[in-house]
Amino acid sequence: MAKLRLGALEAGGTKMVCAIGDENGTIYEQVSIPTTTPKETIPKMIAYFRDKGIDALGIACFGPIELDRDSEKYGYITTTPKLAWRDCDIVGQMQEALHCPVGFDTDVNGSVLGEVTFGQAQGKKCVMYLTIGTGVGGGIYSNGELHHGMLHPETGHVLITKRTADTYAGRCPYHKNCLEGLAAGPAIEERWGRKAVDL
């Protein structure tokens, strides 16, 4: 039986990682495309996948995103702090261009699923995956299921009590001083005047 040829898209706030692999977790190739605006970035992702002969595409995306399949906005990036991407129908655009099934979940749920399926969390029943990058997020896998909806932790937007001497206001457009607004990569760069990788 032939292996499925699968496309994978890790949609991040700084870069979009596009890859081709199979159901056994083998990655055949991958590219990184800078995340600018949907108008610039989505056509580049479509161009990468268009001639790859994929059977399906999985998208693990920064959020918040709409995961309710009954919603007219299923597949949209919704109230993201990445303003250019607000109300972007990423699934619809990819599906229309590539004519294949598209799976869609949060970037952190994609990461935790990868760890449970192929990585360090194989065989575990309950796993939480935390990430700090352009944003802050957390994904939960418990008893064979990824958590969604009210059970999905928007970890990055938990409000934080700062030290009284800390005068940094934070950079989240919604809460300012949430975890993401204070500790994600852009906040670190703004606080220290250098990229986090250089600290």
Indicate where each model-derived feature is located:
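Glycine/GP-enriched mid-protein hinge/lid loop-to-helix segment characteristic of carbohydrate kinases
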Residues: 20-23, 29, 39, 103, ...
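Residue-level signal for inorganic ion chemistry
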Residues: 18, 33, 59, 188
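Glycine-rich phosphate-binding loop and adjoining helix at the ATP-binding site
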Residues: 38, 42, 56, 65-126, ...
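Glycine-rich beta-strand-to-loop/alpha-helix junction loops that act as flexible
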Residues: 57-64, 132-134
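Extreme N-terminal starter segment of soluble prokaryotic enzymes
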Residues: 2-7
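A short acidic Gly-Thr/Ser loop motif
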Residues: 9-14, 131-135
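Residue-level signal for well-ordered, solvent-exposed loop/turn and beta-edge residues enriched
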Residues: 14, 25-26, 76, 145
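N-terminal phosphate-binding loop and adjacent alpha-helix
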Residues: 24-54
